[in-house]
Amino acid sequence: GEGQIVKSGSDELIVTGDNNYSGGTTISGGTLSAKDAASLGSGDVDIAENAKLELSQGTLDNNVTGGGQIVKSGSDELIVTGANDYSGGTTITGGTLTADHADSLGSGDIDNSGVLQVGEGELKNTLFGSGSLVKTGTGELTLSGDNSYSGTTTITDGTLIAAS
């Protein structure tokens, strides 16, 4: 349906199931957790500053905005798409976070303790942590952030440019 989820307060809300609502998701406080991105329906996701969206797997096709953060948890793969402009950063606690384009990762820092796979674009975000970076796809990926990550860097295809 056309309904929406509005998460408020400082506690955690866990959303399950393959939901089909289209009115969007607003996280104004605390953490909204879902094992699979399909639990978020098809509307935009707005994450307020100091709020979090925690996901483990699936494909996040929703546009993500706001000052909040995305947390990738669990050992599975989460794929993010779209030109997302959330600014609270991204934390990868485990598993793999895949973005075909760097624009899908918002503008905040990326704390990586898992695997970050990026296809193309300019990754302006600061990348830190012990996790690895994998360049995928035939395109060109430019790293222009003030990076200090200690994990491996692997190029499976295309070109990786370290600009800073």
Task: List each model region and its residues.
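Surface-exposed loop/turn positions within long extracellular repeat scaffolds
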Residues: 1, 12-67, 80-130, 143-164
